[in-house]
Amino acid sequence: MSSHPQTFYQLTGRGHAPANLSNATLLVIDAQEEYRSGVVQLPGLDAAQVEIAKLLDAVRAQGGAIVHIKHLGIPGGLLDPRGPRGAHLPEVAPLPGEIVVEKRMPNAFSGTELHEKLQSLGHLD
């Protein structure tokens, strides 16, 4: 087993050039406090958060676009949009000017403006 995550291209033995970050859009999906301190805590979240932060730094440095996807859960329940567990993880939270798309379904395209936002950015990678 590999000591670091691999892409689908690597897992299938295909090569692929790295994305051009200045022409890329990074999607950060559901990086929310519920997964660190709520009832659906994820193992390995701290390590994942470090990697997300590295990606954010790299894309920001190259002027790429960033879209944060935030799940709006049930008031008083999972991913409570009014409570602290529904908040973005502060270490990887959106900066002013970065796009935030709020979703209520597991599919970030369902009932959101994600498709339109991505199309308007016009990025290829």
Predicted regions span which residues?
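Internal catalytic-core helix/loop-beta-alpha segment
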Residues: 94-125
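Active-site acidic carboxylates
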Residues: 1-100
